[in-house]
């Protein structure tokens, strides 16, 4: 369908640039942690980790930018794909081989998305709860809940 565009977008050179950009953005995303002072050793998880009580506004921003916005964008995209599939279902000639492979790929990507949401939701929702009232909420979160949400 778009093979010429694909070859141009994902050439060896562009793929290397995408990887470099990904690593640069990842490194850039850690810089605010050092400015806010939100990285501290947490003996509950035996690791240097993001301290949700360091700054409420920063915690909310992290949850929004790193969890809720990606979750919303991907949910919107899946909803659009699903509505398009339902809308054109009757107009497309059935091809069992292509249809099965496409459905399997779609479901695999959807499962990865659901696993992302399920794995990261507890830690992010705990972060939002702590950001609302750090002094009251943080001490009341059971240690087992924090540790299991971290891993």
Swiss-Prot record:
Keyword Acyltransferase among record annotations: no
Highest taxon in the source lineage: Eukaryota
Entry's localization field: Cell membrane
Its membrane topology: Multi-pass membrane protein
Membrane-side (Extracellular) residue stretches: 35-58, 131-143
Positions in the Cytoplasmic compartment: 1-13, 80-109
Gene Ontology cellular-component annotations: plasma membrane
UniProt cross-references to Gene3D superfamilies, sorted A to Z: Rhodopsin 7-helix transmembrane proteins (1.20.1070.10)
Transmembrane segments: 14-34, 59-79, 110-130, 144-151
UniProt keywords, alphabetically: Cell membrane, G-protein coupled receptor, Membrane, Receptor, Transducer, Transmembrane, Transmembrane helix
Gene Ontology molecular-function annotations: melatonin receptor activity
Role description: High affinity receptor for melatonin. The activity of this receptor is mediated by pertussis toxin sensitive G proteins that inhibits adenylate cyclase activity.
Similarity section: Belongs to the G-protein coupled receptor 1 family.
Protein name: Melatonin receptor type 1C
């Amino acid at each position: 369908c778009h093979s010429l565009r694909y070859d141009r977008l994902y050439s060896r050179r562009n793929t290397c640039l995408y990887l470099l950009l990904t690593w640069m953005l990842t490194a850039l995303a850690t810089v605010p942690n050092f400015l806010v002072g939100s990285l501290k050793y947490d003996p509950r998880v035996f690791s240097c980790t993001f301290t949700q009580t360091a700054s409420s506004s920063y915690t909310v921003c992290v949850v929004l930018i790193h969890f809720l916005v990606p979750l919303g964008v991907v949910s919107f995209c899946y909803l659009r794909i699903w509505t398009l599939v339902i809308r054109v279902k009757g107009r497309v000639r059935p091809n069992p081989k292509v249809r099965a492979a496409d459905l399997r790929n779609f479901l695999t990507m959807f499962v990865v998305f659901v696993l992302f949401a399920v794995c990261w939701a507890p830690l992010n929702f705990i972060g939002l709860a702590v950001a609302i009232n750090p002094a009251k909420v943080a001490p009341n979160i059971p240690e087992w809940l924090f540790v299991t949400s971290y891993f």
